[in-house]
């Protein structure tokens, strides 16, 4: 377990660390809920003592051979000929409108680039002029059950899960 605080410059400073033997997990996947909860609690307690604060919200790691990633893309017409936050949201929705197995869920959508009227490598499209907005993304999926089980273990420790991270 790591406890970090956000510094004014946008960097994270680690203020607490807790570690223990990882029991209840096999190859990154929960195989025993009670053992996993005990391992999380022990690491959490150590980290809280070092950081001198109680932790209530966490970003939880997820791993395992159930993690799959692939590329996707999307395209929309730009409303009002100037890219808005709504246009960006719409194009991302089209990129993730893909068929994935019912036992998988999207964990992350990583934007690789935006393209405006054929102009590639656009990083910040909002405010730019154009007629067509495209996006290339990398999508990471994981098993629904694996995600639910690790979240369940963390919640049993009295923590709120903000997000799952790789």
Locate the predicted segments by residue.
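Nucleotide/phosphate-binding catalytic cleft detector across ATP-hydrolyzing
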Residues: 2-166
């Amino acid at each position: 377990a790591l406890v970090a605080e956000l510094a004014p410059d946008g960097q994270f400073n680690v203020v607490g660390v807790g570690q223990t033997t990882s029991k209840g997990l096999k190859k990154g996947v929960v195989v025993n809920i009670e053992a996993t909860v005990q391992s999380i609690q022990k690491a959490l307690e150590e980290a809280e003592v070092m950081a001198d604060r109680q932790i209530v919200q966490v970003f939880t790691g997820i791993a395992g051979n159930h993690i799959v990633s692939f590329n996707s893309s999307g395209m929309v017409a730009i409303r009002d000929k100037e890219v808005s936050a709504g246009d960006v949201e719409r194009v991302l929705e089209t990129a993730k409108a893909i068929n994935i197995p019912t036992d998988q869920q999207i964990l992350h959508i990583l934007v690789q680039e935006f393209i405006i009227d054929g102009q590639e490598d656009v990083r910040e499209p909002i405010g730019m002029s154009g007629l067509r907005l495209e996006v290339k993304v990398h999508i990471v999926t994981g098993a629904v059950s694996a995600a639910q089980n690790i979240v369940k273990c963390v919640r049993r420790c009295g923590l709120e899960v903000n997000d799952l991270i790789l």
